Design a protein with these regions (language model features):
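Membrane-proximal basic amphipathic "stem/tether" segments
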Residues: 1-25
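Short, charged, low-hydrophobicity "junction" segments
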Residues: 5-7, 29-45
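C-terminal segments of enzyme domains that contribute to small-molecule binding surfaces
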Residues: 7, 79-93, 97, 131-180
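Flexible, glycine/small-residue-enriched loop-and-beta-strand segment within the central core
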Residues: 16-17, 37-103, 130, 136-138
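Structural motif
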Residues: 32, 87-88, 103-106, 120-123
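Short-chain dehydrogenase/reductase
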Residues: 91, 109, 125-126
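Beta-rich strand-turn-strand
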Residues: 94-110, 114-118
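HATPase_c (GHKL) ATP-binding subdomain of two-component histidine kinases
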Residues: 118, 127, 133-134
């Protein structure tokens, strides 16, 4: 019966409670006006601090420890942990992994799918595995400003608007360079 009740509770949290509310319940410290879409908070969520105006997108994973099992072969009682801090106005892209001891600096952007193994300075864009510097957020803003449609619309209004736009108003990425 206990397993059944735990299953019901898990379904309740995932269907009826927002990811942000669940994170706060688990002990994640979250600032004001954040958009939290993940539920992957490691086994020590109380070691994670998120500032104000932060966006953490789908399936981002936070890791407050790891690798201890290899060391336990030599030191059976080994365990090590690291706090994670996401500072104000940061953005963490979908499916990224934030490792123990990392700070994401104010106004920084972590590209989707990144593995962040070192702290990120304020105001930069990083991406990749492991995450590497791409550009400043100021450069990112300047490059993308021409694509700004400047609207907050309903789903239907957005669809109609986007389908009416010309091709040059959409973001287009260059091809990956090859050696051929």
């Amino acid at each position: 019966m206990n397993h059944f009740l735990k299953s019901i509770a898990k379904i309740y949290w995932h269907l009826l409670v927002s990811p942000e509310k669940e994170a706060r319940h688990l002990g994640v410290k979250i600032g004001q006006d954040c958009l939290i879409s993940t539920r992957n908070w490691s086994s020590e969520p109380y070691l994670i601090t998120i500032g104000n105006h932060v966006q953490v997108t789908d399936n981002v994973s936070f890791h407050t420890h790891g690798g201890g099992n290899v060391i336990r072969r030599f030191e059976p009682n080994f365990d090590a942990f690291g706090k994670i801090e996401i500072q104000d106005w940061a953005y963490i892209g979908a499916w990224s992994h934030i490792m123990a001891g990392v700070t994401i600096g104010e106004g920084s952007l972590v590209a989707a799918g990144s593995v962040v193994t070192k702290s990120v300075p304020p105001g930069v864009v990083v991406g990749g595995n492991p995450a590497r510097y791409i550009c400043t957020t100021e450069d990112f803003f300047k490059r993308n400003l021409k694509y700004n449609v400047g609207r907050k619309l309903t789903r239907k209004e957005k669809k109609d608007f986007l389908l009416s736009m010309s091709e040059d108003q959409f973001i287009r990425k260059p091809y990956i360079k090859t050696n051929e």
